[in-house]
Amino acid sequence: MKYTELKDKSIKELEELLHAKKAELFELRVKLKAMQLSNPNEIKKARRNIARINTAINAHYSSSVE
């Protein structure tokens, strides 16, 4: 997922996507603790996707203020 894909979405869509990605991150952490996660790098990717979504949300809010 790239920032360019996210910046065209509405705030509501971004917040729904953020909620889904946070749930995915939680599931990955549970799998990691249960030793069922085959690729621990997926946690890093999920965290970065969450950061990208938060950046897009903040950009929408800052552009609407101006």
From Swiss-Prot:
Pfam family, one: Ribosomal_L29
InterPro entries: Ribosomal_protein_uL29, Ribosomal_uL29, Ribosomal_uL29_CS, Ribosomal_uL29_sf
Top-level taxon in the UniProt lineage: Bacteria
TM region(s), chain numbering: none
Keywords: Ribonucleoprotein, Ribosomal protein
Listed GO biological process terms: translation
GO CC, alphabetical: cytosolic large ribosomal subunit
Ribosomal protein listed as a keyword: yes
Ribonucleoprotein keyword on record: yes
Classification via PROSITE patterns: RIBOSOMAL_L29
GO molecular function: structural constituent of ribosome
Entry's family note: Belongs to the universal ribosomal protein uL29 family.
Name of the protein described by the UniProt record: Large ribosomal subunit protein uL29
Organism encoding this protein: Helicobacter pylori (strain ATCC 700392 / 26695) (Campylobacter pylori)
Gene designation: rpmC
